Curated annotation (Swiss-Prot):
Class of this enzyme: ligase
SMART domains hit by this protein: Arg_tRNA_synt_N (SM01016), DALR_1 (SM00836)
Major subcellular site: cytoplasm
Quaternary structure and interacting proteins, as annotated: Monomer.
InterPro entries for this protein: Arg-tRNA-ligase, Arg-tRNA-synth_N, Arg-tRNA-synth_N_sf, ArgRS_core, DALR_anticod-bd, Rossmann-like_a/b/a_fold, tRNAsynth_Ia_anticodon-bd
A GO biological-process term: arginyl-tRNA aminoacylation
One CC-aspect GO term: cytoplasm
Pfam families, sorted: Arg_tRNA_synt_N, DALR_1, tRNA-synt_1d
Catalytic activity: tRNA(Arg) + L-arginine + ATP = L-arginyl-tRNA(Arg) + AMP + diphosphate
Organism: Lactobacillus johnsonii (strain CNCM I-12250 / La1 / NCC 533)
NCBIfam families registered for this protein in UniProt: argS
Protein name stated in the entry: Arginine--tRNA ligase
Length: 558
């Protein structure tokens, strides 16, 4: 039962406000002794020209409902105190009946392409790529839970001037045998060396540009090298995606749109939107805005041209209701321009394009940069995380049967959870030892809580009945109330494209359950044993589902 909705329904019978407005106004009192929900009468005071405290008193006197132990006016608020036993009973019934579908909703429908991860070919996946990958993956899972059809697109950086640089670098310093032995490490080494040498000899940049131009013009040798670099890189990326448990519906990268850009340029020209500026072709976006660069002075294409082609292709291919781009905050200007150009072209659906920005991962307070080579490789981080998890499992539970698999789930899950528990826009510092701890605000803490719940259920070894699931103690109520909040948490996370809402919720539910575990003798044989076990089972169901929405596995033993 949705107790907040019950409050909305009761208040709406007494006041002349739409239910949506009432729902937005309802608050949670900071002091639990004041009740569980509060309706403020300030909005009505403006309409009725009456003291809000008198309005609150009037409403409270007219409402009664046996789902609440008290409904009373406190100053300008109407406070509602839920009947604890009824909330516990109703919530446990809902969770145990709906199982992993608890929290499923129909908030929308239709295709939602999500442009995410998108690493550059021939460079190792770094911690920077982790953010776009796991944020996009979690948003996809959450949108699916509320009715949409997500389409995960890995818009590979498999084209662009960097390939001219890489081809030049490979010809100068490369060697086929080394690349075959360890493709990514060596290709990346050539790329870094190119930038180091180009700082001393700027002519190298011209050579790189010339090589890219040959690639664009279909030079056979250049294309052969480019295809090889792409193939060996993709094999490496897919190995890491498998570790993370992330899959994609499309790998159409930048190169896929090579033959789709000219029609965009032609359309811009036909619609009179292209202007010349210092030899380049641009779309003017108004006095206060920088123009959108479409073609360089040498006629070669730019990111904007390609992204316009991609946006038009995705609309035609998927007829999307929303299109999301999970990319760093530094690209905000680019996506703003993309929407503005599409709008000028007459495509009103551009309003449904959303950039989902995120902050930086730092290490020791320093930004990670590929070009300078001071980059933290994601592959190594995941290996180290699994190794740390393995050490802790060895200490805590040396007889665990499937140690390797659990260490993988805990180590990789710890890295993913740590990323997602931070507000999407926040920058955060990454310290692996903190991340993989079994205590504190970590993924392993949530996983361990779920494993603890599973252990209790194994010990009890009882079939849980749906009869009489009422519990009256404060510890049970705190857990059940948190469980009851899960659908609203899912809704909020999906609307704000904010996985941290789910991660913070999972931590909060874990803390409440662990307090319950410390204060209640769960396995005592009495007439409330069944209800207590139902609470344990419901907690495990919701924790497992919350972790799934974050892309984290929930081992049953740890």
């Amino acid at each position: 039962m949705d107790f907040k909705q019950k409050v909305v329904d009761l208040v709406s019978e007494q006041v002349d406000l739409p239910k949506e407005k009432i729902s937005m106004l309802i608050e949670r009192p900071k002091n639990p002794k004041m009740g569980d929900y509060a309706f403020p009468a300030f909005a009505l005071a403006k309409i009725e020209h009456k003291n809000p405290a008198l309005i609150a008193k009037d409403i409270a006197e007219k409402i009664s409902d046996d789902n609440f132990t008290s409904i009373q006016a406190v100053g300008p608020y109407v406070n509602f105190a839920i009947d604890h036993a009824k909330l516990v009973n109703a919530t446990l019934n809902d969770v145990l009946t709906e199982k992993e579908h608890f929290g499923d909703q129909k908030l929308g429908e239709g295709n939602v392409p999500i442009d995410m991860s998108s690493p550059n070919i021939a460079k190792p996946m770094s911690m920077g790529h982790l953010r776009s990958t796991v944020i996009g993956n979690s948003i996809a899972k959450t949108l699916e839970k509320v009715g949409y059809t997500p389409i995960k697109i890995n818009y590979l950086g498999d084209y662009g001037t960097q390939f001219g640089k890489l081809i030049t670098a490979y010809r100068l310093w490369g060697n086929e045998g080394d690349v075959k032995k360890d493709p990514i490490t060596n290709l990346f080494h050539y790329y870094v060396k190119f930038h180091e040498e180009a700082e001393k000899d700027p002519k190298l940049e011209d050579e790189g540009r010339a090589a890219f131009k040959k690639l664009e013009n279909g030079d056979e040798e250049e294309i052969k090298l480019w295809k090889w670099f792409r193939e060996v890189s993709l094999q490496e990326f897919n190995r890491i995606y498998k570790e993370l448990g992330v899959t994609f519906d499309s790998y159409n990268g930048e190169a896929f749109f090579n033959d789709k850009m000219q029609p965009v340029v032609d359309e811009l020209r036909e619609k009179g939107l292209l202007e010349e500026s210092r030899g380049a072709q641009v779309v003017n976006l108004g006095e206060d805005e920088n123009p959108a660069l479409i073609l360089k002075s040498d006629g070669s294409s730019l990111y904007m041209t390609r992204d316009l082609a991609a946006a038009l292709y995705r609309k035609k291919e998927y007829d999307f209701v929303m299109s999301l781009y999970v990319a760093g905050g530094e690209q905000t200007g680019h996506f703003k321009q993309l929407k503005q150009v599409l709008k000028k072209m007459g495509y009103d659906w551009s309003d449904n394009i959303h950039h989902i920005p995120f902050g930086l991962i730092t290490q020791g307070g320093k930004k990670l940069s590929t070009r300078k080579g001071n980059v933290v490789f994601l592959d190594q981080v995941l290996k180290d995380a699994v190794s740390l998890a393995e050490q802790q499992i060895e200490e805590k539970n040396p007889n665990l049967s499937n140690k390797k698999q659990v260490a993988h789930d805990v180590g990789v899950g710890a890295v993913v959870f740590h990323d997602l528990k931070n507000d999407r826009m926040d920058n955060f510092d990454f310290d692996l030892e903190e991340v993989v701890r079994f205590e504190g605000d970590t993924g392993p803490y949530v996983q361990y809580t779920n494993a603890r719940a599973q252990s209790i259920l194994r010990k009890a070894n009882k079939e849980i009945s749906m009869d009489n699931l009422s519990l009256n103690d404060d510890w049970s109520f705190a857990v059940a109330k948190a469980l009851a909040d899960f659908p609203a948490i899912v809704e909020k996370a999906s609307e704000k494209f904010e996985p941290s809402i789910i991660a913070k919720y999972a931590l909060d539910l874990s803390k409440k359950f662990n307090k319950y575990y410390a204060n209640v003798r769960i396995l005592d044989e009495d007439n409330q044993l069944n209800a207590r076990l139902a609470l344990v089972q419901a907690t495990s169901i919701v924790l497992t589902e919350a972790l799934r929405l974050l892309g984290v596995n929930a081992p049953k033993e740890m």
